[in-house]
Structure formats: C-alpha cells, structure tokens
Curated annotation (Swiss-Prot):
Residues 352-436 form the KH-like domain. Keywords: GTP-binding, Nucleotide-binding, Repeat, Ribosome biogenesis. It comes from Bacillus cytotoxicus (strain DSM 22905 / CIP 110041 / 391-98 / NVH 391-98). The gene is der. NCBIfam families: GTPase_EngA, small_GTP. InterPro entries: G_ENGA, GTP-bd, GTPase_Der, KH_dom-like, KH_dom-like_a/b, P-loop_NTPase, Small_GTP-bd. This is GTPase Der. GTPase that plays an essential role in the late steps of ribosome biogenesis. Associates with the 50S ribosomal subunit. The keyword GTP-binding applies. GO terms for molecular function: GTP binding; ribosome binding. One of its GO terms (biological process) is ribosome biogenesis. Gene3D superfamilies: 3.30.300.20, P-loop containing nucleotide triphosphate hydrolases.
Amino acid sequence: MPKPVVAIVGRPNVGKSTIFNRIVGERISIVEDIPGVTRDRIYSAGEWLNHEFNIIDTGGIDIGDEPFLTQIRQQAEVAIDEADVIIFMTNGRDGVTAADEEVAKILYRSNKPVVLAVNKVDNPEMRNEIYDFYALGFGEPFPISGTHGLGLGDLLDEVAQHFPKVEEEEYDDETIRFCLIGRPNVGKSSLVNALLGQERVIVSNVAGTTRDAVDTPYTKDGQDYVIIDTAGMRKKGKVYESTEKYSVLRALRAIERSDVVLVVLDGEEGIIEQDKKIAGYAHDSGRAVVIVVNKWDAVKKDEKTMKAFEDNIRAHFQFLDYAPIVFLSAKTKKRTQTLLPVINQVSESHNIRVQTNVLNDVIMDAVAMNPTPTHNGSRLKIFYATQVAVKPPTFVVFVNDPELMHFSYERFLKNRLRESFGFVGTPIRIIARARD
C-alpha cells in the first residue's frame, strides 16, 4: 500500500517549510523570511505514532512571474490533487488575510480533509487571538509554533485521524506488479502501449489506490502482470508543466506499489543528470530494477554502439550495477518481446529465499577467500548469517563489532551472494549486528 500523502498549503511566509522540517526531523527545505523562496526538495517521509506518510511542502513550487493569487491557487490545486490530507497553514501574528481566504475557498471546494494550523503562536497568551480563524470554515484551528515545536503533536494526531484506511491489494502474490519511471518524453506510455499491443489481453482498467493512476492487468504466457501507472503519463495542463517536481511524488507512489521498476532512458538523447536522479529513486526503494533504453531504432549504430551505451550507463549508474539493461524500440516494437522475460527474472530474484546452512557455507567460503578487515588492531569476526526478508533479499550477519564491517567488505559479500544464488536485478541488503 502507498503511504498517505500530507500537503502543507498556505500563502507565502506562514512557516510551511519550518513545520515541514519539524515533521520530517531534519532541515531539508531552505528556510528564509523572504516570501516565495523556492526549494530543491519538496517532499519527504514522515512518521507519527506508527503512521508513516509522505509530506509535501507546496512552497517548493516555482511558478515564475505569475500573479500572486495565481501562485497560491496553483499551489493549492497541486496539493488538492496529490494529498490525502491537507494542512492549511496560517500565521497567527498576521491574523486572517485576504490571501488566506483565497486559499480557503479553493480548499473548501476540494472535499479533502483539511486541518487548519495557526503558526507562530509562540506563547500561551497568543492562543486567545486565534479564534478569528474559525471564520475560514475548517473547524477548530490548531495553534502551533514551528520555531519552538509547540502544538505539533496535537496537529499530527488530528492529521492521522484522516488517513485512508489500509486496504489489501486486490492482486495475488503470483502477479508481478511493475511501473515505468523516467523523465518526460522518453516513451513510457508508448512502451506500455507496445507491451499491451503484443497480447491484447487487457482484463480491465482497475482504478488503483494511487489517485489518478490506473492499474492495467494483463496476461502473457500464463503470467499475470499489473502495470502500475505513475499518473505522470498524462499531461495535466499548465500547473503540472510548471511543477515537474510533483511528477517525482507520483512516481514514488507507483514505486511503492510495484515489485519491479523499469527505469526508461532515451537512447536517442542519451543520459542526462535527471536520469540519474530518477534511477536513484528506484535503487533507494529496494525494488527490483530493469534499465530500459527506448528509441533504439533512432540511434545510428554499428557493432560497438550497444556496448558503448551500456558502458556509459554503468559509469553513470554505478549504484545500479545489478540491474539488467534492455535495448528496444516502443515505436517499432523491435526487441520489446525481450522485456517481459527479464521482468520475470528480476521478480523471481527479488523473492529468492536462501537456506540458512547453504547461506553460511557461502559466507564462510567468502571469508576464507578474502579475510575480514581489521581496524585499529581489531579484526571483524563473522559468526553466522541468516536471511530475514525478501523483496529485497535481506541478510543479517552476526559479528563481533558491527563498526568493523567496512562498506567495501560488505560489497564483497554482496557480490559473493549474487554470484552464488543468481540474484539478478535486485538489490541485496546486509545488516551487520553484534552477537549477544
């Protein structure tokens, strides 16, 4: 299930980023007193009383030179579209302003749960001055102080009350769920159409739990699949063209519901920095990953071109060294038939479970081949290992001192596990833990 999404909405300079940073527990947004400061990072993961959620700071939208009220409206519209719950942020020192009323009108029409927060209530005496905010029409205002961290617990308690109830996915464990992520115009939707066109066994378009997304189930050679649409495939007008960062959030929500992530690149244009960022989201998710080079038909090539492009991918995406690469053309459908077998392979690897005795044989053989490292006269000692999870395969290695597990030796162990058990397209996680 995807995490609920909380959006912080409000006119500039009411303290959205300060509250955002308080909730996620680290300073991610740039906080300044200048209204309309833009930020590079406008979403993050939050947690409150075992409720995990994603949170958006709408102050991260850079609209440009648009009129002031248009900016507010566009912020609110994006938040309305993406969020399950909206925190409507106001400023207790300023009282209710015309801009607050403009935001309120938009949010009132949204039919989304809205929790009204009055920020900059820095002392108890100021609480008596928040009653004017009832006039905005969202019930009880929650007085908070982003600077001092006051009142956030009560605010988040109320926010969590409005999270959607957790629903079970309607697909069984044998169904492979995958999504396509990539920058605009790399051919994601064309590739979906090419895949569906090969078999044309579209069971139905089932509305997914991700807002706006449509899950497309289909079957090929007896294997059931579901394409989790990122909802970024469809253009949504001017607001979305100017808020590209929100396509990242939609992609992340699709990734959360997927077993396999296809990172789609443009073979004609080559690799750019944005591709690397997008690929990083796939890697960080712990999902199985396939790198797809689309538009290969448009590339002038000889017998060395594919190898050179693959080497370029490996150089840029060193963190995805485990991901297989598929070259194809969605437009001509050339080589598209090679994709599903690779998806099957990485999905199977993602779910491999290794017997403990066999696992420990491999670990001890690896140690014999390459002795454990030392640090300040102390040598890492590995006692035994066990697998604790799949999707991705996760192993706990019990040692004398976890601090002695150098990242390079951890990488060596991962490579030995990969070679020994045929892990393809899936990250492997190793957790060093002290033996009791």
